[in-house]
């Protein structure tokens, strides 16, 4: 499967699932983006069009983290979950953004669940 086919396949899956996954201020959308070397996660309120929280491997407080990519994703998910709980957010809607629920995406979700987020 060529790189173009993979990208267009992911975009189709993303477009299909976006109709079903909607975040509110009470239950925001946990959106995950995975690049080859980094991972980004955001809590988004789709009703108001605002990003509530964000965490990534590129943020300043995570620049000194060491470990495998999956371990870093679990840490990022845990940090995002703790920040969300501090703001009073307990339930979220998980948006895998067209990526398979496997590997780093699953590790981030597991880290967020360990922190106490419900989805």
Swiss-Prot record:
<comment type="similarity">
    <text>Belongs to the universal ribosomal protein uL18 family.</text>
</comment>
<dbReference type="GO" id="GO:0022625">
    <property type="term" value="C:cytosolic large ribosomal subunit"/>
</dbReference>
<keyword id="KW-0689">Ribosomal protein</keyword>
<dbReference type="Pfam" id="PF00861">
    <property type="entry name" value="Ribosomal_L18p"/>
</dbReference>
<keyword id="KW-0694">RNA-binding</keyword>
<protein>
    <recommendedName>
        <fullName>Large ribosomal subunit protein uL18</fullName>
    </recommendedName>
</protein>
<dbReference type="GO" id="GO:0006412">
    <property type="term" value="P:translation"/>
</dbReference>
<comment type="function">
    <text>This is one of the proteins that bind and probably mediate the attachment of the 5S RNA into the large ribosomal subunit, where it forms part of the central protuberance.</text>
</comment>
<dbReference type="GO" id="GO:0008097">
    <property type="term" value="F:5S rRNA binding"/>
</dbReference>
<dbReference type="GO" id="GO:0003735">
    <property type="term" value="F:structural constituent of ribosome"/>
</dbReference>
<keyword id="KW-0687">Ribonucleoprotein</keyword>
<dbReference type="InterPro" id="IPR004389">
    <property type="entry name" value="Ribosomal_uL18_bac-type"/>
</dbReference>
<dbReference type="InterPro" id="IPR005484">
    <property type="entry name" value="Ribosomal_uL18_bac/euk"/>
</dbReference>
<comment type="subunit">
    <text>Part of the 50S ribosomal subunit; part of the 5S rRNA/L5/L18/L25 subcomplex. Contacts the 5S and 23S rRNAs.</text>
</comment>
<feature type="region of interest" description="Disordered">
    <location>
        <begin position="1"/>
        <end position="23"/>
    </location>
</feature>
<keyword id="KW-0699">rRNA-binding</keyword>
